[in-house]
């Protein structure tokens, strides 16, 4: 499995100009996730970095996720998997037929995009994971949007 650097140094934290409203003495800051160097940056890269650490220490050979194929989450997960030399499989609701830049990018990265009715998402995910296991593969599933423990941990570090 290839090593990749999703981000290597702390990001700047920028103060926000005073907001309108009564916030007392509170001050607001923004962590500049847009400056992350991997896959055009953003908060989803921060989440992907936590999943990367888990995948790197597992026997996974297929990365699976759920989401709109045009989402930043799917783009970043497909990019991460390709950068690691792993296959990627995206389960996407068929109600999402719009082809945007991210959709083309996900496909160019070699990810398989499988559509299903939104009512069949859980069943489709379980069936696909089982099919990969029957093939002798080891799928690693990332919840849509990168939600879950690793994604949450990325914000408390």
For each feature predicted by the language model, list its residue ranges.
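PLP-dependent amino-acid enzyme catalytic core
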Residues: 1-157
């Amino acid at each position: 499995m290839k090593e990749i650097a999703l981000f290597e140094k702390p990001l700047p934290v920028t103060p926000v100009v005073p907001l309108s409203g009564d916030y007392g003495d509170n001050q607001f800051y923004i962590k500049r996730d847009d400056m992350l160097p991997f896959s055009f940056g953003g908060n989803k890269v921060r989440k992907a970095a936590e999943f990367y650490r888990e995948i790197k220490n597992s026997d996974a050979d297929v990365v699976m996720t759920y989401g709109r194929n045009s989402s930043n989450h799917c783009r970043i997960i497909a990019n991460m998997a390709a950068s690691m030399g792993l296959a990627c499989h995206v389960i996407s609701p068929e109600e999402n037929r719009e082809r945007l830049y991210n959709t083309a990018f996900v496909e160019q990265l070699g990810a398989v995009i499988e559509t299903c009715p939104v009512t069949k998402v859980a069943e489709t995910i379980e069936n696909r994971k089982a099919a990969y296991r029957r093939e002798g593969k080891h799928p690693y599933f990332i919840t849509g949007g990168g939600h879950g423990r690793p994604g949450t941990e990325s914000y408390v570090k």
